[in-house]
Structure formats: C-alpha cells, structure tokens
Regions:
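Second-shell residues forming the walls of enzyme active-site clefts
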Residues: 1-118, 125
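Short glycine-centered helix-capping/turn motifs at secondary-structure transition points
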Residues: 112, 132-133
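Short amphipathic alpha-helical coiled-coil/interface segments
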Residues: 123-130
C-alpha cells in the first residue's frame, strides 16, 4: 500500500488536495491492496478505505463505463450497480442494461441491502457539487 500511495495515487492525492469535485474510479483490480480481483469501481477497499478515508476525498465518485468487459464479464448490471453503491460510489456511468441496474438498486433499497441513508449521502454530495457550479 505504501508503494501505491507513493507512486500511483500521487495524482489522485494532488487532485484531492486541490479540491477536485469528482473522481472517476476505473475497473482496474489491485489484489495486493484489496485481496481479490474485484474491480476498483466495485471495491469498498478502493473507494471508501483508500479514496475517501486515506486520501480524504469528500466529493462525488463516479464509475468508469459499467458496460466494459471488466464488469460485464462477471457481474449483471443490477449486481454491478448495487456493489458499486455499497462500495461508496455515488454515480453509475453507462450500465450495460440501465433498467436492470436501476431496478437492482431500487430492490436493494427496498430490501435493506442498501440503506436510504446511503443513497441520501450520494444525493447530498451530488447536490453540493451542482450548487458549486
């Protein structure tokens, strides 16, 4: 992790320090950090632990396009959207099947897998950025 912070994450830390409003998280896997091959965009270790907690980012986190093979090869649109939100992502970009992703999130909230408070956290971050524009 120290090597990652000292090298690959330097531009992200600088962006955070300079007040970036958005960060796009790609689908690269970092098994040395996360312990598995989960894409960074779906990993709570990468989104919440590293980006939000270690780097101190409080803005909007958006996924890279969710219709890419790194996601669609393993996850349904619904599972990918739910997993990304659970990881700490605020906005889902281009799911392969929008209706399925939307319904998956709605079902996860209705079933308690994702709390309404979690959704409200994302909404608040998005509104805060919009008001700054």
């Amino acid at each position: 992790m120290d090597d990652l912070l000292a090298n690959e994450l330097v531009p992200f830390q600088q962006a955070v320090n300079n007040g970036a409003s958005f960060v796009m998280v790609g689908h690269i896997s970092a098994p040395a950090v996360t312990g598995d091959d989960t894409p960074a965009s779906l990993s709570s270790v990468m989104v919440t632990d590293v980006l939000r907690n270690q780097l101190g980012f409080h803005g909007v986190v958006i996924t890279d396009a969710m219709n890419m093979g790194a996601v669609t090869g393993t996850y349904s649109s619904a599972d990918a959207a739910v997993t990304a939100i659970q990881a700490g992502v605020d906005m889902i970009l281009m799911p392969e099947d929008f209706q399925s992703a939307y319904q998956g999130v709605m079902d996860a909230v209705a079933g308690g897998t994702i709390t309404e408070d979690r959704i409200n956290e994302s909404v608040a971050r998005i509104i805060k950025v919009k008001l700054k524009m």
